[in-house]
Regions:
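Feature of extramembrane
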Residues: 1-354, 359-370, 515-742, 763, ...
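Membrane-embedded transmembrane helical bundles of large multi-pass transporters/channels
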Residues: 1-41, 46, 150, 160, ...
Length: 909
């Protein structure tokens, strides 16, 4: 079968300058399209297309707004029973609220206020619920008694005095920066921390006092004349407007909401155990508000604001820190920018290290800095072209693509190594008598050797490459988008590497002057003890085959020990401060670095049935101690009713015989700016958002399964959320590993069968030969997965592809070996099986070993990565390379001997 690319190799040697110009100009032009690659380092890039994902996107599109949470993580020396700690926390929150760069973007996420912190929570509790801080009710009560006791003559005066007393009634507005600055001034009313903490722990509130005042207000007109009632009516209206909101807030559990600001393990006794606190300011991240066009631009701006805020807080003269206090500022924008920047820098560092290591290994083979540089340069060009095609196709890159440059570099260098070594081998075998260096050969001899060596290498490469390409393109059948992109990019990259190896590489070797490399060091083709031993094994092949099968049993059993390691934290470098903060929020604060999970209720929201379904779901969430910050539309309505007396009346009617559901719907329709985060516009769907730890995928799957069962015992509800989907992706990793390996194995088998049927004399022999070439590859995959299991390696975003990559690399080795073995049999039919295999291993086998060590060296640099998935991938792939090499040069010839694919005659010599 003729190789359609042989013509390109001939042209490259005959017209090298033209080919070089076309290759370099074309690839640089193509590489420019790399700017259109879509980079997505978020979790979304790994997500499958399923009902849970669709539901989440529906929820986020319907209810979410563009915002970020700027959070100060304050580590304090001492505990919360010290007044100095609270003064520091109050000052930090006040400074955050007043920070000029953030003020224009404040978003009223927390009941209409942008801030949430321990100090403001205490001051709000003191303001609306704390009996010990009640300095106003006695004065209001006295003023009301004065109105009750007044007669017509002094009624107006008494009403005026009572009107003035209304100003002493606390407002229900959440503390702002000005109020927070008054922490020390209000401490005399509040008392020492131990005093007010005891009152907060008791759960006492002002409900009885306020209800008593409301009763007095309602009775002011009893027994009065109409004229007197007209005088009293304005007082009644203003008092009810001030007291009703306060009364509505008496049942709020202020302490529980504040506990989410302290580490989870300290919540049983936060006042003595807590050593950290969260202070949060919500900001709007709509691009238009920041006067930019793209969300990515906003992310950079918010990240910079977070860094500047941290510096400002640490250096503020208005905040008195103790010696061991620490403060850092976290925002999701800062996390995204610094993590992405670190990954990009690390990939650049690893790629550079890989180039250095590969250069050293290649130089040891070539003994030529020039030839080493050419091979590496062309491989880098091929990688650039690959990224250019990826940009044209607008492929979406994510964290799973981090290993692609190193993978292509290591494999691409192998192809160049095969071409250069085969060229030198052909040149030496042609006529080396009297030649001491490579420069001593004539130009004609070099050109002939280049053509022959390139085309012979290409004959093996073209089979291996297109088998690999079809195999990796079969990833497009996967439901995992990142596997689809990974397979496509690898297939494109392999093609460009092959193309440059058989065109630009021989063209450059033709143009450049030959170097004075000693012939003895340029290439080794003599038999070694190992090559002779490998040939002798084919005389008694069953020994090797049985040993391989016996080895496969215990090693393969390790597959049962394989675990999934697709946790998002593995994609993170904990040495980056903002990443460390991200993990603190997850580990110490019940996953508050995570987007919320959602309970979705499809029901007529404003109806008896809808409210019951909501309350039942809320009771299930409240019963789980790991769940925090559960909130929804009814919490919003209750909070807003403290400010809106009309809404309060509507809500109060819901428990009567004449509930005003339609009025409530009208109110919600008129106030969508308050309810849109939890209520769909048609009032037939509502969501409850809540926080729960979701970094551990298995615990998340189990947790959500149990929660889903509990919710559906009380009615029909669905659960979605980013943490849940990531857990499902983790669960699918094992399936993807099996599916991708199985698909690639099947495709490679079909390709090998088809190629060998077209090359062999009979279809039967072609089928047998294709199967025998494939069999060692499948055994190697079993070995690789088995060793991963025994050594404790996990399947993650990188190693999930190891089975398919092992097959792809293994088929390269198998095709190289069999192609060269066929050449040796054809060249000297009487040499015998030992000589055929020995010479094959002494020549192509030696090049395969060099290529394997080169590839292994390239992947070894991944052990320098700070990211666990990349380190594991590098280690596992080195194992896979060595096993694939061993199977090709030892096991494969023995199998071919057993199945009669190698003539049995021995040489008479």
């Amino acid at each position: 079968m003729n190789n359609p690319f042989d013509k390109l190799s001939e042209i490259s040697v005959d017209k090298p300058k033209t080919v070089i110009a076309i290759a370099i100009i074309g690839i640089f032009a193509l590489s420019s399209f790399a700017q259109y690659i879509v980079f997505d380092n978020s979790e979304d890039a790994f997500w499958p297309e399923n009902d849970t994902t669709s539901l989440l996107y529906e929820v986020e599109d319907t209810y979410n707004v563009d915002l970020d949470l700027v959070r100060s993580i304050v580590k304090f020396d001492g505990d919360l029973e010290e007044e100095s700690t609270w003064i520091m926390l109050a000052n930090v929150e006040s400074q955050m609220l007043g920070y000029e760069e953030l003020v224009p973007f404040h978003y009223g996420l927390f009941g209409g206020s942008p801030n949430s912190g321990p100090a403001s929570s205490v001051m709000f509790w003191q303001q609306i619920q704390d009996p010990g801080s009640d300095t106003w009710s006695s004065g209001v009560e006295a003023a009301l008694m004065n109105v009750v006791m007044s007669d017509d003559e002094n009624l107006s005066s008494a009403v005026g005095t009572a009107m003035a007393a209304i100003t002493s009634i606390p407002s229900v507005d959440y503390p702002d920066s000005t109020v927070l600055n008054q922490w020390s001034e209000t401490s005399s009313v509040r008392g020492t921390p131990s005093e007010w903490q005891a009152r907060m722990d008791s759960g006492d509130n002002n409900a009885d006092t306020i209800n008593n005042l409301i009763g007095m207000v309602s009775g002011l007109t009893d027994g009065r004349a109409i004229e007197q009632n007209m005088t009293i009516a304005p007082l009644q209206g203003q008092l009810m407007g001030a007291l009703s909101p306060l009364n509505a807030l008496q049942n709020l559990d202020m302490k529980s909401s504040m506990m989410s600001m302290f580490p989870t393990e300290s919540r049983d006794d936060p006042w003595t155990l807590a050593n950290m606190a969260l202070i949060t300011v919500a900001i709007d991240t709509k691009p238009s508000l920041h006067e930019v066009e793209l969300e990515t631009e906003v992310s950079v701006l918010v990240s910079d604001m977070s860094v500047d805020l941290e510096t400002s807080l640490i250096n503020s003269v208005n905040i008195e820190y103790s010696e061991n206090d620490e403060l850092t500022v976290f925002s999701f924008s800062r996390f995204a920018e610094e993590q992405a920047g670190n990954v990009g820098a690390e990939i650049g560092m690893l790629t550079s290290a890989s180039v250095v290591i590969l250069g050293i290994i290649l130089w040891r083979q070539f003994r030529s800095v020039r030839d080493t540089s050419i091979v590496i340069f062309l491989t880098l060009l091929a990688i650039g072209a690959t990224y250019g095609v990826s940009g044209v196709l607008k492929l979406e890159f994510n964290a799973a693509m981090n290993s692609i440059p190193i993978l292509l570099l290591a494999i691409g260098v192998d192809y160049g190594l095969h071409v250069v070594l085969r060229y030198r081998e052909e040149l030496v075998n042609m006529d080396s008598e009297g030649k001491e260096t490579m420069a001593d050969f004539s130009k004609e001899a070099r050109i002939k050797a280049l053509k022959t060596g390139t085309m012979l290498t290409s004959a093996a490469l073209v089979v291996a490459i297109f088998t690999d390409m079809v195999g990796f393109l079969s990833f497009r059948l996967s439901s995992q988008n990142f596997l689809v992109v990974f397979g496509t990019v690898i297939a494109v990259g392999l093609f460009f590497i092959y193309l440059l190896s058989i065109t630009a590489l021989p063209a450059l070797l033709t143009v450049l002057k030959p170097q004075k490399i000693p012939v003895a060091k340029s290439v080794k083709v003599e038999k070694s003890k190992f090559s002779t031993w490998s040939g002798e094994q084919a005389l008694n092949p069953m020994t090797v085959v049985v040993a391989a099968l016996l080895l496969s049993l215990p090693v393969g059993a390790g597959i049962t020990q394989l675990e999934i390691g697709f946790d998002f934290r593995d994609q993170l470098d904990e040495d980056i401060p903002v990443v460390a903060n991200f993990l603190i929020l997850s580990d110490e604060f019940s996953g508050q670095n995570q987007p919320p999970l959602y309970v979705v209720l499809n029901v007529e929201v404003f109806s008896e049935e809808g409210k019951d379904a909501y309350l039942n779901s809320m009771s299930v969430l409240d019963a789980d101690p790991s769940i925090t910050d559960q909130t929804g539309v009814w919490e919003v309505l209750e909070l807003e009713s403290s400010r809106d007396s009309d809404l309060r009346e509507i809500l109060d009617s819901l428990d009567t015989a004449n509930p005003e559901w339609l009025s409530l719907q009208d109110w919600a329709d008129a106030n969508q700016d308050l309810t849109f985060r939890y209520l769909r516009g048609d009032f037939k769907q509502t969501v409850i958002s809540f926080q729960a730890p979701t970094l551990d995928w298995q615990k998340t799957v189990d947790f959500v399964t149990e929660l889903d069962n509990s919710l559906n015992e009380e009615g029909e509800a669905s659960i979605s959320g980013r943490g849940l989907i990531l857990a499902q992706v983790s669960e699918d990793v094992a399936k993807s590993a099996v599916a991708s390996t199985g698909i690639v194995a099947g495709i490679i088998l079909i390709m090998l069968l088809g190629i060998n049927i077209s090359r062999e004399k009979t279809p039967q022999r072609g089928i047998l030969k294709g199967f025998v070439m494939w069999l060692p590859l499948s055994i190697v995959v079993i070995w690789v997965y088995g060793l991963m299991g025994w050594f404790g390696y996990q399947l993650n975003s990188q190693t999930v592809t190891i089975g398919a990559l092992t097959l792809g690399l293994g088929v390269d080795y198998a095709v190289h070996f069999v192609t060269r073995l066929d050449e040796e049999i054809e060249h000297d039919p009487n040499a015998g099986i030992v000589n055929w295999i020995s010479i094959t291993n002494a020549t192509t086998g030696r090049a395969m070993m060099a290529a394997a060590f080169t590839t292994a060296g390239g992947f070894a640099v991944l052990n320098l990565s700070s990211l666990l998935p990349l380190r594991l991938f590098g280690q596992v792939f080195v194992i896979a390379i060595l096993l694939a090499l061993v199977s090709s040069i030892i096991l494969l010839p023995c199998l071919m001997s057993i199945f009669g694919l190698i003539p049995k005659e021995e040489s008479s010599v």
